Amino acid sequence: MKKIFLLFTLVFSFGVLADDHLPENFSMYQTNFLFNCPEPEMCFAAFDKYMNSPMVSKEKFEVDFFALQQNGWDESTHGVSWYFKDADQYAKAGELFATTKAGREFRKSMNNLEVETISDTLTVHSYGKVLAGETADNVVSLRWSLEVTDPAKFVPLWVNFSKSIEKYDWTSNGYGLQTHYLGNNGTGITHEIWASFNTVQDALAFLSGLNNSKEFAEYSPKSREYSKFKRSYMEVSLKQYNPD
């Protein structure tokens, strides 16, 4: 019952927030898969073949295949995120994966390569903002995974902090907050904070500026009252399909 109540609280509080604080081109739902791939080139080739199969490619799903860097938290080496505009797109993607020949061949390839799925989650954007650049150009992102214990207090604190660092030349091209609805992460993660950049160098400059800023020094101890840090890592996009 406690988990059900917490889920209701998250859905209600963040659902209201999402309606008022998302750019029009942001997806309604995201599915995120982190996995360990012993042979990255072959994993990518198998996924690319699936995405370019006739039945899948005609749907023009927005998808990102990426590599993980500085991920010392588990065995994930790569990931795939799907961005769905609505529930119908989400349902269609699941149907094609489960019922088509292309989906069957892709699953067989992954099994033959001994790919291990580490996490599989369904998330929604609770807050998002684009400051500069296009999605296709912002190929690097930093991510922080949290267990938020008091969303009503954490979210406005984080939003105000994020806005306060927009003025710096090292700030990100975009940032957002995602809420976990379903899936396995094994560590109590409820939310993800992300910040996007054109290059790895820009992301590193952001980290330096962030950690030396007075705003972060003030925000950090307050945020720990309402959230628990779980992990952080960098994502570098290897290929984007139909970026919006």
Regions found by a protein language model. Name each.
Residues M1-I4:
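Positively charged n-region of N-terminal signal peptides that target proteins for export
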Residues L6-T9:
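Internal alpha-helical transmembrane segments of multi-pass membrane proteins, especially GPCRs
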Residues S13-F14:
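N-terminal signal peptide c-region/cleavage motif recognized by signal peptidases
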Residues A18-E218, K222-D244:
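Short S/T/G/P-rich N-terminal loop/turn motif that feeds into the first structured element of a domain
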